[in-house]
Design a protein with these regions (language model features):
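Proteins with a high burden of low-complexity, intrinsically disordered sequence enriched in S/T/G/P/A and R
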Residues: 1-4, 159-161
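Metal-dependent amide/peptide-bond hydrolase catalytic core
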Residues: 85, 89-184
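Histidine/acidic-residue-rich, glycine-tolerant segments that coordinate divalent metal ions
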Residues: 2-122
Length: 184
């Protein structure tokens, strides 16, 4: 006695900054709301350029990073400021240096989404958005610690305050059921 359900999942992927207005992370929301409770098997169908029964879908997490400093006039009194943009740039460079030590399937992507208000003002606030990826969820957790250390080091060296804004959660890596794989 099995019941077959077809569940559509809009906004199923993590979209940078989307969690602020409720978008993205649809699969995580469905799981948290119990849509898959008492489900024996689950299949995912995703449009692609080719058919694959066992695709590599790695774990991913999205976070935003905020640095808070102290504004100052860049020409007249820069020495009294705490440059939040310097913190972002150092964090970005720390991660760039870390990349040579990462496994090929470990990925870190980031952009600065807010770098300041005016070039003649030392920025007191900056924000960046990051996606962290690894082959398995356990590896993602280890990689996230390394990435957070890059941000902490940048905050420490610039005397800025660091704030980590979590996304909708972690997408764990896809694990294909071997029995279903053979049947499909």
């Amino acid at each position: 006695n099995y019941e077959i359900k077809l569940v559509g999942c809009p906004a199923e992927e993590i979209i940078p900054l989307s969690y602020e207005n409720g978008g993205g992370g649809g699969k995580i929301k469905l799981i948290n709301e119990g849509v898959f409770k008492n489900t024996a098997y689950s299949m995912m169908i995703h449009p692609a350029t080719r058919n694959e029964v066992d695709p590599l879908m790695i774990a991913v997490k999205q976070i935003d990073i905020e640095f808070y400093g102290k504004a100052a006039h860049a020409s007249g009194s820069a020495y009294v400021g705490k440059n939040a943009l310097d913190a972002q740039i150092l964090a970005y460079n720390n991660i760039s240096a870390l990349r040579q030590q990462l496994q090929p399937v470990e990925k870190v992507h980031g952009i600065i989404t807010h770098g300041g208000e005016s070039p003649n003002i030392i920025p007191d606030y900056t924000r960046s958005s990051w996606m962290i990826r690894a082959q398995e969820t356990k590896d993602l957790k280890k990689l996230e610690k390394k990435i957070l250390n890059c941000f902490k080091g940048a905050a420490e060296s610039t005397s800025c305050k660091l704030n980590v804004v979590e996304g909708n959660g972690t997408y764990e890596n896809l694990v294909t059921d071997k029995k279903l794989k053979k049947i499909f």
